[in-house]
């Protein structure tokens, strides 16, 4: 997998209360990923970008909510979420380098 595809597959971490609990208690990390990304692509992207060993990848397609605006109905974009489980002894720390 080339470096350009790695950055197109992983769009960024998904920060939420549930994702924080998963990271603290179970060592699982949640990412927003491209809608056409496969589990194997996501695994290779995380392993090459963060130098960790991935045990399991689960994905969910999240449907965008319908929102009411002054001009009628609108819809948020659909997106894909990946939950990354690391092998025991591995840790992913992408929050400490952000300043």
Curated annotation (Swiss-Prot):
Cysteines paired by S-S bonds: none
GO molecular function, one term: structural constituent of ribosome
Entry-linked InterPro entries: Nucleotide-bd_a/b_plait_sf, Ribosomal_uL23-like, Ribosomal_uL23/eL15/eS24_sf
Gene3D superfamilies: 3.30.70.330
Record bears the keyword rRNA-binding: yes
A Pfam family the protein falls into: Ribosomal_L23
GO biological process terms, semicolon-separated: translation
Highest taxon of the lineage: Bacteria
Gene Ontology, cellular component aspect: ribonucleoprotein complex; ribosome
Keywords: Ribonucleoprotein, Ribosomal protein, RNA-binding, rRNA-binding
Protein family according to the UniProt entry: Belongs to the universal ribosomal protein uL23 family.
Role: One of the early assembly proteins it binds 23S rRNA. One of the proteins that surrounds the polypeptide exit tunnel on the outside of the ribosome. Forms the main docking site for trigger factor binding to the ribosome.
Subunit structure: Part of the 50S ribosomal subunit. Contacts protein L29, and trigger factor when it is bound to the ribosome.
Protein name: Large ribosomal subunit protein uL23
Biological source species: Ectopseudomonas mendocina (strain ymp) (Pseudomonas mendocina)
Lineage, highest ranks first: Bacteria, Pseudomonadati, Pseudomonadota, Gammaproteobacteria, Pseudomonadales
Gene that specifies this protein: rplW
């Amino acid at each position: 997998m080339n470096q350009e595809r790695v950055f197109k597959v992983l769009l960024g971490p998904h920060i939420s209360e549930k994702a924080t609990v998963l990271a603290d208690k179970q060592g699982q990390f949640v990412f927003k990923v491209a809608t056409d990304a496969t589990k194997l692509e996501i695994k290779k992207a995380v392993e090459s970008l963060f130098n960790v060993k991935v045990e399991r990848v689960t994905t969910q397609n999240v449907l965008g909510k319908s929102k009411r605006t002054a001009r009628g109905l609108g819809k948020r974009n659909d997106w894909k979420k990946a939950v990354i489980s690391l092998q025991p002894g591995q840790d992913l720390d992408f929050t400490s380098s952000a300043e």
